[in-house]
């Protein structure tokens, strides 16, 4: 077999391609040199744009009244007229005494709320205490009933044992004798 030439994809033999590529590149270079471009055109600005560029436009400044921004709540001095957009609940106080009376009323109301909360807490605590006492009383009652039942059972046993004490002692001795004589080993099959 004849030796195969290694084939490389994307590359062709250098001898043939080098001759072909040179004339193309040289021709393109020549054409670029020969072709003359026209000089770039200057963009002229229009007269009206020049005047507008030179002028500085004055921006309009709005007053606070025109903007209609809401004012912050402040203490209004005596004699000041109420603003137009006054809220319903807003109260303007003319004198110091009136303001202090309103403040005292509000404080008293708040203290009343606090006092009522404390009273409710006390009442709830009393209710809890009463419930706990009732539960303890029920528990003690149950214990007493249980103790009484135990005592009655013990008394019944004592009555039975006192009447039959002689006969039981004879029977128990005879049973123990018979058990000792007749002890047998028992085997159970599972």
Curated annotation (Swiss-Prot):
Keyword Transport carried by entry: yes
Signal sequence extent: none
Primary localization: nucleus
Amino acid composition bias (Basic residues), ranges on this chain: 181-190
Annotated keywords: Coiled coil, mRNA transport, Nucleus, Ribosome biogenesis, Transport
Subcellular location: Nucleus, Nucleolus
Start-end of Basic and acidic residues biased regions: 39-49, 129-151
Superkingdom: Eukaryota
Region (Disordered): 1-70, 129-190
Coiled-coil stretches noted in the UniProt entry, renumbered to this chain: 109-165
InterPro entries: Loc1
Compositional bias of kind Low complexity: 1-29
Gene Ontology cellular-component terms listed: nucleolus; preribosome, large subunit precursor
One example of a Gene Ontology biological process annotation: mRNA transport
Binding partners and assembly: Component of the 66S pre-ribosomal particle.
Function: Required for efficient assembly and nuclear export of the 60S ribosomal subunit.
Annotated family: Belongs to the LOC1 family.
PANTHER family: 60S RIBOSOMAL SUBUNIT ASSEMBLY/EXPORT PROTEIN LOC1, 60S RIBOSOMAL SUBUNIT ASSEMBLY_EXPORT PROTEIN LOC1
Protein name: 60S ribosomal subunit assembly/export protein loc1
Native source organism of the sequence: Neosartorya fischeri (strain ATCC 1020 / DSM 3700 / CBS 544.65 / FGSC A1164 / JCM 1740 / NRRL 181 / WB 181)
Gene field: loc1
